[in-house]
From Swiss-Prot:
Pathway: Porphyrin-containing compound metabolism; protoporphyrin-IX biosynthesis; 5-aminolevulinate from L-glutamyl-tRNA(Glu): step 2/2. Its cofactor is pyridoxal 5'-phosphate. Its EC number is 5.4.3.8. PROSITE patterns: AA_TRANSFER_CLASS_3. It is an enzyme of class 5 (isomerase). Homodimer. This is Glutamate-1-semialdehyde 2,1-aminomutase. It comes from Pseudomonas syringae pv. syringae (strain B728a). The gene is hemL.
Length: 427
């Protein structure tokens, strides 16, 4: 038995499914999940000392690559001063100032400890601000695991093959309205019928939890206009896209301004962090300024602020995101060329430093239906063939891939060499 197999067997005794987040269990791709013990740069190393080029990046945060020395130094320095105070710190204000500088729509910001907390809090705030109960989300979009958002969700919910989670009361779900992603007419029709009841529309600007589906041309701007027409708060869930597709997030990349935004992953530099924010008019309703309650024991904790501030400053250098996008483009072009040469139907998508891989006959991937008709069985085989070749992809056909600035020519060659062999084996 490999050490990962032994560790997984032991883990299942006291951890449900042997993992602390479902997609890690490899249920979607089969086999034993890898247990990692080290990560540096573009690589992760498992418990059996095999090293892999990593395109998961801890599900998005590691945009600098793993174990960046400046981030580690910042955390070590803060360790000397304590782990958590449960009181305000200067770094929290520095973080808020920097986020508001980098993302112009953010006039005020509240730190939390996860992306789920951020989206949950933003929706509560939108409801409190508008006095309305219903929310509108999109099929296949995932906004964390709070009850009202696990309706027709993506990410792990798709991996499990269930559109919604048991344990979500019907009374909660009835206030969550869903329409297809990238279908502006469906939004228009629904708001024409019940717009006066809808507090907010929450959307991933790039749907990164049904792999990676960019918005159709004009889609985000159309949502902006419909929200303005019906007095609905527009929330961009940028937990995944924030600071990755562009320094100012997807809202800068696509030129559409939301009312509220949520962030996570990169903003913590690998530590557990999230935040939500937006218009001062709306944020002034959050406690202690207003009546909408939100709190957190570890919100704005100094270790996370140290890691996050350092990360955001490093990725702010001119040219950073151009380099990240260029590597991702070269990766996808190389994969497409090798799939075509092998006669394998294959489609890729990209938004900055995130990407999607689909075994599909479709000309392009635009809708949830396009995603669901891709060949997940072929992806399973491809995943394990790439793993054998030293490349770690997300262990699900429904999860986006991520590149980092640590990925370079050597990693690209290794990845494409492994892919060429994998595509040949898939014939």
């Amino acid at each position: 038995m490999s050490r990962s197999e032994t560790l997984f067997a032991n883990a299942q005794k006291h951890i449900p499914g042997g993992v602390n987040s479902p997609v890690r269990a490899f249920k979607s791709v089969g086999g034993t999940p890898l247990f990692f013990k080290h990560a540096a740069g573009a690589y992760v190393t498992d418990e059996d000392d095999k090293r892999y080029v990593d395109y998961v990046g801890s599900w998005g945060p590691m945009i600098l690559g793993h174990s960046h020395p400046d981030v580690l130094d910042a955390v070590r320095s803060q360790l000397e001063h304590g782990l958590s105070y449960g009181a305000p710190t200067a770094m929290e204000t520095e973080m808020a100032d920097l986020v508001c500088e980098l993302v112009p729509s953010m006039e005020m910001v509240r730190m939390v400890s996860s992306g789920t907390e951020a989206t949950m809090s933003a929706i509560r705030l939108a409801r409190g601000f508008t006095g309305r109960d219903s929310i509108l989300k999109f099929e296949g979009c995932y906004h964390g695991h709070s009850d009202s958002l696990l309706v027709k969700a993506g990410s792990g919910a798709l991996t499990l093959g269930v559109p919604s989670s048991p344990g979500v009361p019907a009374a909660f779900a009835k206030h969550t309205l869903t329409v297809p992603f990238n279908n502006l007419d469906a939004v228009r029709d629904l708001l024409a019928e019940v717009g006066q009841e809808v507090a907010c529309i929450i959307v991933e600007p790039v749907a990164g939890n049904m792999n990676c589906v960019p918005p159709a041309p004009g889609y985000l701007q159309g949502l902006r206009e419909l929200c303005d027409e019906h007095g609905v708060v527009l929330i961009f869930d940028e937990v995944m896209t924030g600071f990755r597709v562009a320094l100012g997030g997807a809202q800068a990349y696509y030129g559409v301004t939301p009312d509220l935004s949520t962030f996570g992953k990169i903003i913590g530099g690998g530590m557990p962090v999230g935040c939500f924010g937006g218009k001062r008019e709306i944020m002034s309703h959050i406690a202690p300024l207003g009546p909408v309650y939100q709190a957190g024991t570890l919100s704005g904790n100094p270790l996370a602020m140290a890691a996050g501030l350092t990360t955001l400053r490093l990725i702010s250098r001119p040219g950073f995101h151009d380099e990240l996008s260029d590597y991702t483009r070269r990766l996808l072009e190389g994969l497409q060329q090798r799939a075509d040469a092998a006669g394998i139907p294959f489609v890729t998508t990209q938004a900055g430093g995130m990407f999607g891989l689909y075994f599909s006959e479709a000309d392009e991937i635009v809708t949830f239906e396009d995603v669901m008709t891709s060949d997940s069985e072929r992806f399973k085989r491809f995943f394990h063939l790439m793993l054998d070749g030293g490349v770690y992809l997300a262990p699900s056909a429904f999860e986006a891939g991520f590149t980092s600035i640590a990925h370079g020519d050597a990693e690209l060659k290794l990845t494409l060499d492994a892919a060429e062999k994998a595509f040949a084996a898939l014939k």
